[in-house]
A protein has these predicted regions:
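Acidic, PIN/NYN-like endoribonuclease modules and their adjacent C-terminal/linker elements
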Residues: 1-3, 98, 102-128
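Short, well-structured N-terminal submotif of metal-dependent ribonuclease cores
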Residues: 1-37, 46-62
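Histidine- and aromatic-rich ligand-binding microenvironments
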Residues: 7, 37-38, 90-91, 112-113, ...
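A generic structural signal for short hydrophobic patches within well-formed alpha-helices
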Residues: 11-12, 42-45, 74, 116
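Residue-level signal for well-ordered alpha-helical positions
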Residues: 17-18, 48-49, 80, 119-122
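Structured helix-beta-strand junction loops
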Residues: 31-32, 63-64, 104, 119
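General small-molecule cofactor/ligand-binding pocket signal
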Residues: 36, 67, 124
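Active-site neighborhoods of divalent-metal-dependent phosphate/nucleic-acid chemistry enzymes
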Residues: 66-111
């Protein structure tokens, strides 16, 4: 059983019924993979929820485990911002996502790897 940190873009694609997420995510859950999100992703999802998506968004709490943000994660996010905000345009949300993945030693599943230029962050690939 592995743990995977879902980026907001993957969660949104799943919520909106985009393939291949509508089959991949249920398959992962069936295999008892632990799918997680951060409080930052929770905020991003609820900020952009469309009319009619509210119930689906609330149901995410039933299937996704929420990572806890800690001082260690905050420190690492600050280091990422210091190193990559000017050169790569890394923003606060992505710095927290990367720091959460790094500190907890779990891969990020994202559609935008360019948002994560950090060399010490691993990525989940849905490809075989």
């Amino acid at each position: 059983m592995a743990e995977i940190l879902l980026d907001s873009d993957v969660i949104i694609a799943w919520l909106r019924g985009h393939d291949p997420f509508t089959t991949l995510i249920p398959d992962l859950l069936e295999r008892e993979e632990v799918l997680t999100w951060t409080p930052v992703s929770v905020a991003e999802i609820f900020a952009g929820v469309r009319t009619g998506e509210e119930r689906q968004a609330e149901n995410l709490f039933l299937v996704l485990e929420t990572q806890i943000l800690s001082a260690e994660i905050g420190r690492k996010a600050g280091q990422y911002l210091h190193a990559y905000s000017k050169s790569h345009g890394v923003e606060l949300a992505d710095a927290f996502m990367a720091a959460t993945a790094h500190v907890n030693r779990i891969p990020i599943w994202t559609l935008n790897k360019k948002h994560y230029p950090m060399r010490d962050v691993r990525f989940f690939s849905s490809s075989p």
